[in-house]
Amino acid sequence: MKPIVSILLFCALAVVIMGHPMNQGYGIPHDVVKLPNGQWCKTPGDDCSKSSECCKAKDTVTYSSGCSQEWSGQLGGFVKLCHICNVESSMC
């Protein structure tokens, strides 16, 4: 029983640390608009340098959007990605 609990705990911890590839909120409805500089806003999961580059959620009361640093295991460092998440979520 102890090994099973240890394995489950390890798996849960790995998911929390590494995240899921689609956890930036791509499935949440968002508006793709043209920015003042002529470029299109960046969708969730795209690289960004500031929050104003990222597409906003259609429901701005329930969802928040922005540019945040996340750990990339593939690159071995932090990257800034656009995301959309639920305002009430502790991960937002």
Curated annotation (Swiss-Prot):
Entry superkingdom: Eukaryota
Lineage of the organism: Eukaryota, Metazoa, Ecdysozoa, Arthropoda, Chelicerata
Family stated for the protein in its record: Belongs to the neurotoxin 21 family.
Tissue and organ expression note: Expressed by the venom gland.
Species of the source: Trittame loki
Protein's UniProt keywords contain Transport: no
Function of the protein: Probable neurotoxin with ion channel impairing activity.
Disulfide bond residue pairs: 41-55, 48-67, 54-82, 85-92
Protein name: Toxin ICK-16
Pfam family, one: Cys_Knot_tox
